[in-house]
């Protein structure tokens, strides 16, 4: 894999490190503060399902024994772990979600840092943290899509710098993580497909192609990816509920995914996309700018296929069934954050070459902070004023989630 040239933020290492770290710590601290303030928001519908099944699992009851769902049981298991650690309450579940989103922000930082340097990493991580609390994507709730993103990014990170030294074991572990992402929710399998395509692309771009190594890596990736599902099927079979699992998560899920027409799906997509964009227009514009600058910045060209492929398969992950629920868009947030980091780094390069009088890093950080502030102010009542119960009512309208507690 070609090594990227150093990005221009290295021209002011001390100054940039100070301002970028301050900005990142401020944003992450603010986001954590908001999540902690809202720990007691009543569980919504999907959270209630995951929590109930997770609670049954802690009591030794298998999924699909008393509760039927078309979702694979990964997120239910994650809830069981969270409740075992933080308690079987809404606050405990949301504290676990806070840890998950912070870990994901760290993954986004590493991913963007490899692409375009430290500056891009901190802007991308800060962008993800802000995106992840958006009411428009139901980011304050512990949806399965949050749990898909973390292992998916971890697996992709293991494969990002794929060269001759990468062992088959590392590829297998990446497959395990990507398989775990799919176990959290079936649509997470799209990230496994991206990983397979990336492995193929890296190999066929080499001057000397090693087909045996390519087949070995694809085999290890596929084996690792299937292991979580195989293990799950074995456990469910041991509990005597495999037939129910197969009925609900394959037969019923397939029928459910075929209900929506293409026209209806496109209408939903544009409707939800508009709501998501309007919730943080400045941050989304920063991401769109990153998509454009991706083609302009020479240092980014070795990663062009990676970023575009990641974006394309992230979009594919929200498409199954064409339902385009608001929380499906959580799967797009790592891509959006990554592109925001690209925009910041590429913008810094352009400003540095133009001999801009103001410090380029300071200007870009101020622009990012302004974009984040705009998003926070747009939903300020939810983030800073309303009680947890009122927040639930504001986001979910007439759904009686508070009353069901």
Question: Which residues fall in each region the model found?
Answer:
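Transmembrane-lumen/periplasm boundary regions of multi-pass, lipid-linked membrane glycan transferases
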Residues: 50, 180, 207, 214-300, ...
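Transmembrane-helix signature of polytopic, membrane-embedded enzymes
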Residues: 19, 108-131, 149-150, 168-170, ...
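Membrane-interface transmembrane helices that cradle and orient dolichyl/undecaprenyl
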Residues: 155-173, 200-207, 282-303, 344
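Membrane-proximal, lumen/periplasm-facing interface regions of secretory-pathway glyco-
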Residues: 41-42, 356-405
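Hydrophobic/aromatic-rich transmembrane helices and adjacent perimembrane loops
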Residues: 190, 315-316, 322-363
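Short hydrophobic alpha-helices at membrane interfaces in multi-pass membrane enzymes
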Residues: 161-179, 209-220, 302-312
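Perimembrane helix-loop-helix junctions
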Residues: 6, 10, 191-226, 291-299, ...
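Membrane-interface alpha helices of multi-pass inner-membrane proteins
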Residues: 170-186, 191-196, 227, 311-319
């Amino acid at each position: 894999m070609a090594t990227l040239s150093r990005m221009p933020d290295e021209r002011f290492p001390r100054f940039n490190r100070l301002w970028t770290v301050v900005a990142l710590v401020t944003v992450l601290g603010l986001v954590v503060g908001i999540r902690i303030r809202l720990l007691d928001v009543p569980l919504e519908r999907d959270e209630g399902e995951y929590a109930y099944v997770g609670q049954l699992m802690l009591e030794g009851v298998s999924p699909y024994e008393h509760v039927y769902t078309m979702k694979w049981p990964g997120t239910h298991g994650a809830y069981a772990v969270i409740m075992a650690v933080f308690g079987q309450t809404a606050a405990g579940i949301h504290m676990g979600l806070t840890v998950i989103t912070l870990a994901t922000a760290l993954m986004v930082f590493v991913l963007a840092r490899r692409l375009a340097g430290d500056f891009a990493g901190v802007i991308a991580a800060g962008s993800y943290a802000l995106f992840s609390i958006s009411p428009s994507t139901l980011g304050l709730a512990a949806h399965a899509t949050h749990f898909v993103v973390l292992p998916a990014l971890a697996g992709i990170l293991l494969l990002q710098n794929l060269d001759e030294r990468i062992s088959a074991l590392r590829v297998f572990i990446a497959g395990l993580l990507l398989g775990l992402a799919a176990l959290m929710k079936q649509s997470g399998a799209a990230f496994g497909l991206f990983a397979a395509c990336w492995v193929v692309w890296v190999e066929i771009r080499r001057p000397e192609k090693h087909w045996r190594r390519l087949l070995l890596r694809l085999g290890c990736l596929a084996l690792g990816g299937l292991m979580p599902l195989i293990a799950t099927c074995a456990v469910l079979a041991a509990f005597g509920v495999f037939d129910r699992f197969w009925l609900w998560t394959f037969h019923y899920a397939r029928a459910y995914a075929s209900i929506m027409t293409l026209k209806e799906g496109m209408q939903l997509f544009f409707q939800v996309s508009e709501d998501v964009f309007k919730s943080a227009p400045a941050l989304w514009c920063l991401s769109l700018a990153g998509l454009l600058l991706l083609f302009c910045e020479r240092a980014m060209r070795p990663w062009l296929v990676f970023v575009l492929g990641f974006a394309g398969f992230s979009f594919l992950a929200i498409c199954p069934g064409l339902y385009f629920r608001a929380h499906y868009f959580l799967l797009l947030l790592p891509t959006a954050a990554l592109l925001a980091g690209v925009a910041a780094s590429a913008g810094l390069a352009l400003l540095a070459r133009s001999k801009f009088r103001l410090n380029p890093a300071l200007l870009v950080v101020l622009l990012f902070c302004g974009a984040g502030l705009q998003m926070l102010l747009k939903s300020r009542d939810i983030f800073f004023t309303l009680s947890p119960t009122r927040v639930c009512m504001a986001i979910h309208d007439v759904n009686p989630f508070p009353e069901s507690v």
